């Protein structure tokens, strides 16, 4: 550039000499009788020549910069082609870019970026601007993930910036960036879909009314190294409606559709499918509502052990572990019930716990080995009080989350018409034994603990082709028949009440119906959501019930309850008349989010390992691995 400056100085000197010569020639020609030229004309001519020389100098400087910087056309081609390349090559290119930045002493992962407001707040604050308005005296800083990138030239880039389930347009203009064209193009060529960026600029709306932020500073904060799936373009597709709890949804419209990929890579599922984030927000609201409901009724939230010496409180197969220091076998809890009732004995009259339970059983559309429940225990209450509380809690929750008592649910698949489920209280109530006899036209012996009753139920299952694998205990046979004849009728919320004692070892006997208990199960959409009863508080009867369960266990029913001596001892100190209640949080979340698979409402559901991992896990251990 110094050579160019010297040339400019020389040219200006020559121009001055030319001007002097021209002036002398004009004076000479005047003496010779030619027409005189004015001094003003000569000055104008001199200025024009100076402007031409200045323009030439600037053009030379631009040409010099163009040689030093990559050509805009080639960079645009790279930006356009990088998402067309092989995914592995794309990943390797991104790694090379980061390595190059680090080699130059740059930190591609800044420690901090100060955000002035969230994207939803930005939309709320500036959404009322008129089309074409810019507020250049206001400065805001936003951060989020780039979900869409497009450009109209090397000097103008557009981004969709997503955060907190909302998006705003970023309109990056080279003329407002404080960078020269080459630096601007390099920065925005390296910004990719999926990257997290910080933007500092002023708010405004485009002429078409798109709320945007116009950055003066654009900072790459974190980099997405993988090529993200993108939704196929469909010019005829309607803009999807915003999903709300209680309404149907369509996972087939998701960007990432494959269930295996979605459940194994939940982070990617949530990045690409906005609705998935809403599902988990709804689940959190359900838990929050339950907690608030019980807190308002003066319940105390407590925590009880998740590892126990005895797997009690429910009829289920436990997970077994080992405590090395104590050298003893422990069981992951299948229910917190027995501990919570001991707290009632201790004088805490209303307690509840929301937490994980673990059952080593099958995995299907409504069962996961690790699941979440809420259990509460209320002194001086019975199962009638709990039915009323259940109606108030669930109907109130549905109304708060959806705006009404009725929800839509794709019970028969997303390709079929949805059903309507009505949570308007009061809920339907049916007697288990009486309704079963009525629907299946049975006449079950009254003494359900007798051999006669067991044989009758075995014959009934055979007659209706209801499968009940061994051991064919009376409790298991009844459960299978109820699943065949009663549960399918329970679409709207329905209480199945007054279960037999042989099916309810922890429930109190019915005060007027021999052989039955004061218990209910709430079914919705043919699945159990709640289980509750008036608690058995007679320690002598409780020991006898545990003894009966032991007989079932000895006959092969490994889900039968074991005797918990500590619990029985606590009952001997006196348990007040108490009502106990349990709710399956996961299944309720499924209903209110139109989810047909329990994995949809669990961030990280239980999955079989991928085939290659499974093969490695099952391979014999070598001495080195041992």
Curated annotation (Swiss-Prot):
Q: What is its EC number?
A: 6.1.1.6
On this chain, the residues bearing N-acetylmethionine are 1
Q: Where in the cell is it found?
A: Cytoplasm, Cytosol
For the ligand (Ca(2+)), the binding residues are 521, 528
Q: What is its main location?
A: cytoplasm
Entry binding sites for substrate: 313, 337, 375, 377, 531, 535
One GO BP annotation of this record: lysyl-tRNA aminoacylation
Coiled-coil parts of chain: 37-69
| Cofactor(s) the protein needs | Ca(2+)
List the biased-composition ranges (Basic and acidic residues): 42-67
Question: What UniProt keywords are attached to this protein's entry?
Answer: Acetylation, Aminoacyl-tRNA synthetase, ATP-binding, Calcium, Coiled coil, Cytoplasm, DNA-binding, Ligase, Metal-binding, Nucleotide-binding, Protein biosynthesis
Q: Please give the residue ranges the record annotates as the region Disordered.
A: 1-84
Assigned GO CC terms: cytosol; plasmodesma
Positions of the DNA-binding region:
141-217
Please state which protein family the record places this protein in: Belongs to the class-II aminoacyl-tRNA synthetase family.
Q: What does this protein do?
A: Catalyzes the specific attachment of an amino acid to its cognate tRNA in a 2 step reaction: the amino acid (AA) is first activated by ATP to form AA-AMP and then transferred to the acceptor end of the tRNA. Promotes aminoacylation of non-cognate tRNAs and translational recoding of lysine at nonsense codons.
PANTHER family assigned = LYSINE--TRNA LIGASE, LYSYL-TRNA SYNTHETASE
What is the protein's name according to its record?
Answer: Lysine--tRNA ligase, cytoplasmic
Q: Which organism is it from?
A: Arabidopsis thaliana
